[in-house]
Amino acid sequence: MILMMKNTKVLETNKDGSIMIYEEKLLPFSLQKEDLTYEDFFFNWLSVRPLSIGRTNAKAILNNAGIPQNSLTIARICHGMNLSDCYWVKEREEDTSWDKDNLYDHDMDPLYADTALTGKSHHLSKDKFHTPELTAQGVSAKCWIKENDGIYLYKVGRKELPASEILDVLGIDHVHYEKAEQLKEYLSKDRIKKIEDVGEIIVRSKLITNQQQGIIPFEEFAVWCANQEIDDEYEEAKRRDEKSYYEMQIADYILNNSDRHVGNWGFYFDVEENKLQGMYPLMDHDHSFDEEETLMSQTNEGKTLLEAARIAQAQLNLPVKDILEIPKPEYLMDNEWEQVRKRVMML
């Protein structure tokens, strides 16, 4: 098997378990280590590219296409292509190329998208398909749709809208979500009604990566830190982009976000140079406005969200009181808004 970065051969595995590295500087960050092995490539990198079986509608996607629930098999079938970077894999004699098959330039299979978002059954082809759904991370129901002005993520997530509005007030860089008014083009009225009847809506956000700039989640950044013998990956993250790191502490407290984890924050990187840049915009706030009053920070060890936010606010002095001047955001419940205002006053 050959690991490619666009049209450049990066690494090749052999049947005897050996590997040949062609472009060391282009290795994925989690593979940048001494004594890289065959097992590192297959089991620590390739096997974690595909979607999680625990993701909503994941089993429907795989079952409808007749794809086994085996991560390496899934990765081989979809060439490990995703919308986070420009890496992909192919067999030595396989007739395919980046220009022919990459997800950024070509239309996507709409049936995969419908199954991914709603769970609807379709006969999906595993022999000829073009979809990022087999490598989309996270657990919520979601899908990618290519439109005239770019690629959009559609997901079930009422809370993304008020979270976006609040972060706009704070001036914190984040992925902007909007109500998916275009939904009628992809789903029937009955399916939209079923989602709205349970108090949810479908929102969309524009893809933040492209063929020049990719992202790596903190989970992979932490592996890279360990391989570079950097003792504290959180301190290293803060050192590399202190402002964004502190903004995340404040955002998670104000939103009372219970779902900041190693897979939904991290860094941009330059695809051609394979060099880390600053943190990418904050995202995934569909578990915000948690009812629990005291949540522990997942990005500042041993601190509550309030304690971590106070440390950050002492550094940034963001205009948090401006939140008190805006009307209650649409789609936010009265009690959720009351708790937001209470947290602002405590900060």
Segments and roles (model prediction):
Residues 1-250, 254, 268-347:
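Phosphate/dinucleotide-binding and metal-coordinating scaffold of catalytic cores
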Residues 261, 266-269:
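Conserved protein-kinase catalytic-loop segment immediately C-terminal to the catalytic Asp
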